[in-house]
Amino acid sequence: MDLTDDSPDGEVKIHKKDFHHPYTPYPIQEKFMQTVYDVLEQGKIGILESPTGTGKSLSLICGSLTWLRDFKRKEFEGILNDGFENSEEPEWMIEAAKVRKKRELIGRREEMERKLGRIRERERCERDRMSGNGNGNMRGGKRRKVGGDGEGDLVGGSNGSNEDEFLLEDWESDGEIGGSGKKKTGDEAIFSKETLELKKSIGMWKFPSPMPLEEFPSKTTEKDKDNLHEHLRHLPLGSRKNLCINPKVNKLNSVTAINERCAELQQSSTPKEHKCPHLPNKDNKPLVSTFRDHALATIRDIEDMGALGKEISICPYYASRSAIKPAEIVTLPYPLLLQKSAREALGISLKGHVVIIDEAHNLMDAIAGIYGTEMSLKELKLAKEMLGNYFMKFAKRLKGKNRIYVAQAIRVVDSLMGYLMKRLEGTEIDGVVDQKELLAGKGADQIDLFKLIRYLQESKLARKVESYTEHTRNIKQASTIPHNNKETPKSTTPILHTLTSLLLALTHPTTEGQLFFLKSTSTSPSPSPDLITLKFQLLNPAPHFESIVSSARAIILAGGTMSPFSDYTSILFPSIPSHKITTLSCGHVIPKTHLFASTVSRGPTGIPFKWTFANRGNTDMMDELGRVLLNVCTIVPDGVVVFFPSYNFLSTILYRFSIPSSGTGSATATATGTEKGKGKTILERLSEKKPIFQESKEESVETILAAYAKSIAEGKGALLFSVVGGKLSEGINFSDALGRCVMIVGLPFPNMHTAEWKRRLRFIEESAVERLTSFYQEKESNNKDGNGNEEEGNGKKKENREKIQRDQILQQAKGEARDYFENVCMRAVNQCVGRAIRHRGDWAGILLLDERYKGERVVGKLAGWIREGVLRGEGMGMGDAGGFGRLMGGLGRFCRGRREVL
């Protein structure tokens, strides 16, 4: 159900339900919360869009938690009646039994709340005490000192001569492959700053207790009534890298190494004195309970969980599992949610529960990132060198299958290297990899990849080899530079773990993903091994999301820029009928007078803008762009942000802008109407109006933004050149003076001529053909009579009908591939534009510089509030249709009007 439709079925009926919003909600927030409630109540899929700055995350929390408490209240009433429906006992006995059961359930609930309340009170008093004496430690009182872990030096942590620690344990198993072995990435980025602040604010408000309020007639005072509301029980989960408190484990330089070392310390073969002392066991169960109660008592972030584990001296990674069941909200990063194996490791079951994914506009990219991997020729050479050195050192001491499997790993790496070196000599810059050809060298095609992968995962070969490599490097460094006390930085790239992920990718069905080779462009006459890479790209995220879809009661995908919606329904939910999917696109909370939006199809001299790949070297268009920027920077106060489709295109523009003008017909002369700018570059003329800042791959975002904001704060204004999909296009707020105008130059389509995009679009097309063929076949079967015969008259037209059907299917499939390609582009545009207006009082102009933005298909894929602004401006004669002069006049009046109000 599309809630943006004007049809009665698409309307949301606002029942003025109390969603316990901490402020007075806007109408769109009420609509959003009601939609969230309805989706959860009806067990549907919700794809919801509300622009950034409209209180989306807060509305998500209020709507979902109101539903949760209502659901639990109904569940409580159901439990009370359970077992009494068909009872033959007298009614008074049944009622008495219900009362006893009710008191028992309520008593348990109240006892838990009292326990958590006492913890909250103690922590509050401790915070007051610590702030009163000037101590900056606000996480609690004096922490219990965490004792030594009783563990010897970790592998790779010593320069000693004993090398037995690097030997592999005997390998005997040749059974079936076990475990997922999937690469876990992205654990470092848990929550955004805004999300953490929002989570903290939740702790300040309460929601009604799930217990029926009529069961407390004696509680009439304000304090008693307040007790009828419960604090939220929230639990943040993270990876071992985020939560490990064993200093000899968490100092390791990769997630995989930490995971493997943690598992190793728990093995029965590990001596007791070397086991991790923080691991939960039968002797420290009370500490686990204490951790659980403290974790649930207040709203905590992931750092708080680690600090709590240190204070109690219990592993927060494992102890947090005890708090999952009593928690009402569990927050966790993408990799822990999206990987079934990770959920199972944490003890998380989604059966019957609700899954809400905020900022879901990059969900499909996140899934692809988790299951994708790449490895360069240089990395493969390094892997071969590491494996070779290890094999030479320990060959005589490796037993049985260890020796065989290490040799097999070297042969496979040799084959991969041979393939890439052959491709390096060819003329193709990229292409699809034929797996048979990839493993044709060194007899690698005779190796059982499944067994080899299982061996690499379970034998810990990767960590042993990398630790030995580091060990030998340290010894060499110590012997060659004895007086140098500087520590050599550790490699942050676990090469052999990457190799394992790449081999695992080779076992994926070709219907799910594809392996490519990619050459980087270089002007060097001699190609470098760095410049060619093997890359596995996931094409179909649906199978990896299916375990969530099939288990959860309801799923909500929410974001500020979810439009266009069609990708989510066709790719993530291909088997879900349309009536089970609800979509909602909210408008903005700002008044219409706070937005000026328009396409800019041509500049002041009438040169049209059509920034296709073929036209991006057009110097006339570049000069016309310079004239537009000079006009805009003259009219718009404070900060102006300009987004370009790529870093290469931005470099081309800046190079053109750095060429001195010749006067007549130049960008400067035409823009000013005089010869004043003769001899100056466009960049020089622009810098006279506003200081110029540029996004770069090398410089940090913080440095650029700080200088940009400082210039605006000093009243100089600023012009910032950025890149769509770059560092500044997502997660950065250009609110208020930081973004009084956002300009998008061109349409940021990906390069459809690359092997990766050709294959991706072909996959979309093939999937659509398969789905549509199945649909028509089912429809055809419905036209047959009970004996399986076609109805009279149909047989003669069958051949012609099937041909028309095939043509229709192919045409529709090509249309879906085209839609997907356009959607990727327009979602990026919407994301960039959404950086500007961040709250109700904010205002900004939005200019879309390309004549293709006037096309119906493109306009239809803009976020609703942007599209309305563009169409409204056109209707009032202030848009691009009235000519460039009229457009600039409208923009000038808009800016002056807003500044006068302020």
Curated annotation (Swiss-Prot):
UniProt-annotated location(s): Nucleus
Family per record: Belongs to the DEAD box helicase family. DEAH subfamily. DDX11/CHL1 sub-subfamily.
Any one GO molecular-function label of the UniProt entry: DNA helicase activity
Source organism: Sclerotinia sclerotiorum (strain ATCC 18683 / 1980 / Ss-1)
Compositionally biased spans, kind Basic and acidic residues: 793-804
EC number: 5.6.2.3
Name of the molecule in the record: ATP-dependent DNA helicase CHL1
Cofactor requirement: [4Fe-4S] cluster
NCBIfam families: rad3 (TIGR00604)
Gene of this entry: CHL1
Taxonomic superkingdom: Eukaryota
Function: ATP-dependent DNA helicase important for chromosome transmission and normal cell cycle progression in G(2)/M. May have a role in changing DNA topology to allow the loading of proteins involved in maintaining sister chromatid cohesion in the vicinity of the centromeres. Has a specific role in chromosome segregation during meiosis II.
Keywords from the named record: ATP-binding, Cell cycle, DNA-binding, Helicase, Hydrolase, Iron, Iron-sulfur, Isomerase, Metal-binding, Nucleotide-binding, Nucleus
Lineage: Eukaryota, Fungi, Dikarya, Ascomycota, Pezizomycotina
